[in-house]
Amino acid sequence: MTDAGDEPSLGAPDDLSQRERTAVSALVRAMADDEFVLAERYTEWQVRSPTLESDLALSNVAQDEYGHARLWYDLLQDFGASEAELIWEADPVDFRHATLVELPFSEGDWADPILRSYLFDVYEKLHLQALEDSSYPRIRDRVGKVQSEETFHREHAENWLERLCADPEGRERVQSAADRLFPYGL
């Protein structure tokens, strides 16, 4: 269906070719799984952050990431999958998240979740910017909400990176985290 010379309306999965459905589903699944697994990892740091303020901030970030995962998983339900099938009943090998979000944290080092957050959030900023003009409105409509919350996440990580790098020991810890995590952020 077209509007007087405009591009076709792509409002539902049935408006897509099989190839397009497969591509959209794969893209959205990876985005949902990234958010879900990262949120799960962040919960491991709750009550272990260096300050009460940072603990609360990381809890808020984890909650936001769960919310973002829910936005993307809800979209996947349009393609016939249920939330239970996508998350709770899924075989772990069926998850399509980035290795960066899955890696265990370096034991007891706050630099690890902070640098991981920064690397992922910079990637996500670029990824979401690329999706702002998606021809599939069900993706495009979700991007703005996620972007507004991700701005807070990036600022939180940037502020902590500055604090951690304020002294030689902190810079060394951040560098160690970068040596470990950066290859997975590429």
Summary of predicted features, one role per range:
Residues 61-92, 157-165:
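Conserved alpha-helical segments that form or flank metal/cofactor-binding pockets of metalloenzymes
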Residues 38-60, 124-140:
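Helix-loop segments that flank and shape redox-cofactor active sites
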Residues 138-186:
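A contiguous pocket-lining binding segment that forms or flanks enzyme active sites
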Residues 7-29, 89-116, 134, 167-168, ...:
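Acidic/His metal-coordination segments adjacent to aromatic residues that form catalytic metal sites
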Residues 34-42, 68, 120-127, 153, ...:
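Amphipathic, well-ordered alpha-helical segments in soluble domains
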Residues 14, 18-45, 53:
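Terminal catalytic/cofactor-binding subdomain
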Residues 99-156:
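Internal, conserved structured core segments that host functional sites
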